[in-house]
């Protein structure tokens, strides 16, 4: 994939995360600045999501550590765990929030 396609795929994925947070009613603040999306929780903990253009990966940093996601067969998959990106974001949000979050 070229860089334009990479950025479009990441933009779409981040938009889905924003919509899921908004629709869930969870108390999670988010902000995107440049290539970085920051999710912040009541306890001031954060999840950082960063696009890595040179490697064409999405990186996620949270209390659980750092994870790299590569685009394979139409999904962003964690190179360490094999978990799909949106599922991992939801899991990590629940850990940070300390509660179950209802998002599709």
Swiss-Prot record:
Record field: transmembrane: none
Record SUPFAM superfamilies: Frataxin/Nqo15-like
Residues annotated as signal peptide: none
Protein's GO biological process: iron-sulfur cluster assembly
Keywords: Iron, Metal-binding
A single GO cellular-component term on record: cytosol
A GO molecular-function descriptor: ferric iron binding
InterPro entries: CyaY (IPR047584), Frataxin/CyaY (IPR002908), Frataxin/CyaY_sf (IPR036524), Frataxin_CS (IPR020895)
Record CDD domains: Frataxin
Xref: PROSITE patterns: FRATAXIN_1, FRATAXIN_2
Family designation: Belongs to the frataxin family.
Function description: Involved in iron-sulfur (Fe-S) cluster assembly. May act as a regulator of Fe-S biogenesis.
Name of the protein this chain belongs to: Iron-sulfur cluster assembly protein CyaY
Organism: Vibrio vulnificus (strain YJ016)
Gene encoding the protein: cyaY
